[in-house]
Amino acid sequence: MQNEEGQVTELYIPRKCSATNRLITSKDHASVQLNIGHLDANGLYTGQFTTFALCGFVRAQGDADSGVDRLWQKKKVEAKQN
C-alpha cells in the first residue's frame, strides 16, 4: 500500500531467502539479513555493500556459511562479466 506521496506504508514487506529462494515469513525469527561490504585492492571499505537474506531453515541445517560463500562467488562472477 502506498500513500499520496508514493511511499510504501506497509509494516511487513516479505523477503526471499537468497540461498534457497524460499519466502521468509513474518514468523521466521531465525532469519537474518547480512550486508557484506565491498573492499578495494588495498583492503579498504569502499562504501558499497551487497545484501543477502538467509531463512531460518538454511541456518538450522548449518548451510548458512556455504550458502553465503556460494552467493558471494556467484556475485563476483556476475560483476566480472559486466
Curated annotation (Swiss-Prot):
Query: Which InterPro entries does the record cross-reference, listed alphabetically?
Result: Ribosomal_eS21 (IPR001931), Ribosomal_eS21_CS (IPR018279), Ribosomal_eS21_sf (IPR038579)
A Pfam match is Ribosomal_S21e
- What superkingdom does the record give? Eukaryota
Q: Which GO terms describe its cellular component?
A: cytosol; cytosolic small ribosomal subunit; nucleus; plastid
What keywords is this UniProt entry annotated with? Acetylation, Ribonucleoprotein, Ribosomal protein
Gene Ontology biological process terms in this record? translation
Q: PTM N-acetylmethionine: at which residues?
A: 1
GO molecular-function terms, A-Z = structural constituent of ribosome
Q: Which PANTHER family match?
A: 40S RIBOSOMAL PROTEIN S21 (PTHR10442)
> What is the similarity comment for this entry?
Belongs to the eukaryotic ribosomal protein eS21 family.
State the name under which the record lists this protein: Small ribosomal subunit protein eS21y
Which organism does this record belong to? Answer: Arabidopsis thaliana (Mouse-ear cress)
